[in-house]
Every structure is written in C-alpha cells, then in structure tokens.
C-alpha cells in the first residue's frame, strides 16, 4: 500500500479513536458500558496495528502436485462454469480438478459442466466430474475427491467463486515456509453493486480479511481458512478424513462449518496464514432472509469450533486467545447493552442515547477505516453495518447459541448469480 494511503488510514483511525475515547469515558465512565468501550478500543488498536505490520509471502513457489476440489449443490449453471474456467486459467499448473455434484435436484449446472468438459477436451484433460446420487453435504462431496487424489496440496474453491489467475501461485508462496500448513486468500463480493446489503457485506469481508486475518496471520494463527479460496497440505486432510466426514457435536452429526474444522486440523500441525495477494470474488446473499440463514450457520460453527480452539490453550495459547477475545467481546456487548437499558444508575437520557449511537457509528468507521482508500463512498455506509451488527446480527448470534443443537441450519437451495 502506498505510504500516502497508509498515513491517511492511520491519521483517520487516530482521530476516530480519540472521539471514541472521549464519548466512552466522559459519558459512561467506569460503568459496564465504559469498561466494554475500553476493551473494544484496545482490541481495535491491536488488530489494526498488527494488520499494518503484515506483509504477504514472496518468492517463487516450490513444485507441488495440486488438486482443486469444487463441491456443488443446486448451483447456478453459469456460475459453476465461470468457477471452473477461473480454475483452469491458473498460472500455476493443477494436476487434477474435481467437480463433485452433491446430489443436486437441479442438474442444469452439472450437465453444463459435463458438456463443456467433453467439448473442450484439450484444456479439460485433468477435470474429473462426479455426480453423487444422494445429497450428503459439502464434507462428503469434498471427501470423494480427497480420497481419490494423491496430490501434495489441496485447493478448495466454492462453486460460486471466481479466483484470479495468479491466486493459486500466490497462495503457494506461503508454503515455502515449511511450518505453514494452510493458507487463505482475500475475498470480496462479486455482486457488491447489487444492493445495500451486498455493499455492506463487501465492507465486512474486506475488514475480515484485510484487517482481522492479516492480524491473525502475523501470529501464524488465522482462525478460519475461507471456503472460496484456501489451500491445505495433504498431511492436514488425509489423516483426518474420517473424522472430518463423521464429526459430531453434542451427540449430533455436523454437516457444515467445514472451513473452520479443516483450519483447526491445520492449526494442530503448524501455522495457518493469510495471503493478501491471492484474490477471489464470490456471490453473497442479496436477500435478508438468505443472509440471516447464512449468518446463523456461521454463528453455530463459530461457537462449536471455538470450544475446540479454547481447548488448545496449553498447546497453542495464541489460537485460544484470539478465540477468547472474540467470544468475550460478544458476551460483554450483550451485558453492556443490558446494563445500558436496565441499570437505573446510568440514567439513560437523550444525550447518552445519542452518544451511544455515535459510538456505534464511530466503531463501525474505525473497523473499516482501511476501506476508505478503496471505496470512499461505500466507506461512509459503514455506520449502517454497525446498526445491522448491533440490532440484528448480535441478537441472531445469541439465538444461534441458544439453538446450537438444532441441525437444520438452512443449507441453501438456490443461488442467483450477478454479472
């Protein structure tokens, strides 16, 4: 990033944090809301500070036998074809490309893929297409490919994702470090321009990768290698394959949360990292109902795998600390809001209510300050994501925790692609 842009981000962040400190300490003092504010400000400073120290891996990748695995279920036909074409266009050669249809009721996508592979024989010699008769879930679709490949490295790609031509080559640079066992790239919303929700989602994605994963990568412990674009060494996948397919939680089979699960397997062996120069675009939900279903699934996966991560506090304390921070911030926010609403000692009036809403807005701007140099106009929408986060996503997260044993997690039935 040019020094001018980096300086602008730092100065803007310092300015926003200064306002945040004033509103927090002078209006809420040592109350629960004030204490939460202090911890939140500290956490924001740590994450942004670490992200500024982040540098992508460089050098030329070693020679690996790489297999791409693309599971698909009721995917839009053109979307799946575009995904395949983007994988075929990689600058780093792939030994195998597996497309596994997981028992889709709508077979248009897999039929289009089969026609394309049969027609474009010269460029599709290494493409293996498989149709499962029964829908068993993404894990089993991936496992079908894992079990049949002798690759050194597995590239996982979602069926609604476009990966940039050099994405695999850039990811593999991280494997020059033999202690790295998994890596993920940078994700943005392909349909960002569709509506307000997709714009807000893209803002969230950019922060989740450009700040959060960049900060975690500096410690060698990103918590989630994202499904749209990640690589894993063979040693991560094959020894854990049966455990991956048959994972249970509270006595019930687990059908999603595969990205976090595979990342935890990699963490057991070594480092997990983020490579900002490996990029992809993916379709995101454009309807609130679909978006909330997605968030509900992710929330349940977050809580389940967080329990596993916290258990690593002796073997891998950094992973446990990142996880504990995320869980504690969520719980403290719930307590702070409850205290603000029901504790008469705080004496909530219009001024403090306005200050509290201002804090929400400024925190959202702080979280996404780096987005200012990428999409300045969209950056100004950040406070709207703050409102969505506080009044919709946080209650949903609490609901997800309370219903974590419910295995009907709303797997998508249909995906719409936007050009």
UniProtKB/Swiss-Prot annotation:
It holds the Pfam family Glycos_transf_2. It comes from the Bacteria. Its cofactor is Mg(2+). It is a multi-pass membrane protein. Its EC number is 2.4.1.212. One of its GO terms (cellular component) is plasma membrane. CDD domains: CESA_like. Pathway: Glycan biosynthesis; hyaluronan biosynthesis. One of its GO terms (molecular function) is hyaluronan synthase activity. GO terms for biological process: extracellular matrix assembly; hyaluronan biosynthetic process. It is an enzyme of class 2 (transferase). It catalyses: [hyaluronan](n) + UDP-N-acetyl-alpha-D-glucosamine = N-acetyl-beta-D-glucosaminyl-(1->4)-[hyaluronan](n) + UDP + H(+); N-acetyl-beta-D-glucosaminyl-(1->4)-[hyaluronan](n) + UDP-alpha-D-glucuronate = [hyaluronan](n+1) + UDP + H(+). The chain crosses the membrane at residues 8-28, 33-53, 318-338, 345-365, 376-396. The keyword Transmembrane applies. The keyword Metal-binding does not apply. It is found in: Cell membrane. Keywords: Capsule biogenesis/degradation, Cell membrane, Glycosyltransferase, Membrane, Transferase, Transmembrane, Transmembrane helix, Virulence. Belongs to the NodC/HAS family. Glycosaminoglycan synthesis. The hyaluronic acid capsule is involved in the pathogenicity of group A Streptococci; it may be the major virulence determinant. This is Hyaluronan synthase. It comes from Streptococcus pyogenes serotype M6 (strain ATCC BAA-946 / MGAS10394). The lineage of its organism: Bacteria, Bacillati, Bacillota, Bacilli, Lactobacillales. The gene is hasA.
């Amino acid at each position: 990033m040019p020094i001018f842009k980096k300086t602008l981000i730092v100065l803007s962040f310092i300015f926003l944090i200064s306002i945040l400190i004033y509103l927090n300490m002078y209006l809420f003092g040592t109350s629960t809301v004030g204490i939460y504010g202090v911890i939140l400000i500290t956490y924001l400073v740590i994450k942004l500070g670490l992200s500024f120290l982040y540098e992508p891996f460089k050098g030329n990748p070693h020679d690996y036998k790489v297999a791409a695995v693309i599971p698909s279920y009721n995917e839009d036909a053109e979307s799946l074809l575009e995904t395949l074409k983007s994988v075929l266009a990689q600058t780093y050669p792939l030994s195998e490309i597996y497309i596994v249809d997981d028992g889709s009721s709508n077979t248009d996508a897999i039929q289009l893929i089969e026609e394309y592979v049969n027609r474009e024989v010269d460029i599709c010699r290494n493409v293996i297409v498989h149709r499962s008769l029964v829908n068993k879930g993404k894990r089993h679709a991936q496992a079908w490919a894992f079990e049949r490949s002798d690759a050194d490295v597995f590239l996982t790609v979602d069926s609604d994702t476009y990966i940039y031509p050099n994405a695999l080559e850039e990811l593999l640079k991280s494997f020059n470090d033999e202690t790295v066992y998994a890596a993920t790239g940078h994700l943005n919303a392909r349909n960002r321009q569709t509506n307000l929700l997709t714009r807000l989602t893209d803002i969230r994605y950019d922060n989740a990768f450009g700040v959060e994963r960049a900060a975690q990568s500096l410690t060698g412990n990103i918590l989630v290698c994202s499904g749209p674009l990640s690589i894993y060494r063979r040693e991560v996948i094959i020894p854990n394959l049966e455990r991956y397919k048959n994972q249970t939680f509270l006595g019930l089979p687990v059908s999603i949360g595969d990205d976090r699960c595979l990342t935890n397997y990699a963490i057991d062996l070594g480092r997990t990292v983020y490579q900002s120069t490996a990029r992809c675009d993916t379709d995101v939900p454009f309807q609130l109902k679909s978006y909330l279903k997605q968030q509900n699934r992710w929330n349940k996966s977050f809580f389940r795998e967080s329990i596993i991560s916290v258990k690593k506090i002796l073997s891998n304390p950094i992973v446990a600390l990142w996880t504990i921070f995320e869980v504690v911030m969520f719980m403290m926010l719930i307590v702070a809001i409850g205290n603000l609403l029901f504790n008469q000692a705080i004496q909530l009036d219009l001024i403090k209510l306005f200050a509290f809403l201002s804090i929400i807005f400024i925190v959202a701007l702080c979280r996404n300050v780096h987005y200012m140099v990428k999409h300045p106009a969209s950056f100004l929408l950040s406070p709207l994501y703050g409102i969505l986060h506080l009044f919709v996503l946080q209650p949903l997260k609490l609901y997800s925790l309370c219903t974590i044993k419910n295995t009907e997690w709303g797997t998508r039935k249909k995906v719409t692609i936007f050009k």
